[in-house]
Design a protein with these regions (language model features):
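Membrane-interface extramembranous regions at the lipid-water interface
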Residues: 1-34, 80-95, 114-136
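Hydrophobic alpha-helical transmembrane segments in multi-pass membrane proteins
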Residues: 27-53, 58-83, 90-118
């Protein structure tokens, strides 16, 4: 199970530059849940560090701020990429997917995001490519 989660997360991070094709429910859910858990672990670790360790962390972050910004940018781009590819699996174009998911901050976007997690994609090829292995 952990190996499978690691593989799907790594696949999303490697395909961060490619918002075309289709992503299965499993790939979308594993990537989003993994990034959420890792972000919560980092925040919890920072919150409970003693003050003398925080100074070391600030020095490290200041020294490697360009690298940390690049890592954060790759994670964010990978999130958008897997979101668009999941929308392609359900037949939505990239603009429609990004617009509907950004409504999450407002009123009805949570319904669309729930649909991305729950609705199964088609097992047939569509205009965005062949079906992912999990849909067949």
């Amino acid at each position: 199970m952990l190996k499978e989660i690691f593989i799907y997360t790594l696949k999303c991070l490697l395909y961060f530059w490619c918002p075309f094709g289709r992503a299965s429910r499993k790939e979308y859910a594993y990537y989003n849940n993994t990034t959420l858990v890792l972000a919560l672990l980092v925040v919890a670790a920072i919150k409970y560090l003693p003050p003398h360790k925080l100074e070391w962390l600030y020095a490290f972050a200041n020294e490697f701020k360009v690298a940390l910004c690049c890592i954060c940018a790759i994670v964010v781009l990978a999130s958008y990429s897997v979101l668009v590819r999941r929308g392609h699996d359900l037949g939505y174009n990239w603009f429609s997917t990004l617009f509907r998911s950004s409504e999450c901050m407002m009123f009805k976007g949570w319904q669309f995001n729930r649909r991305l997690f729950k609705e199964e994609g088609s097992s047939l090829p569509n205009e965005y490519g062949p079906a992912p292995e999990e849909n067949r």
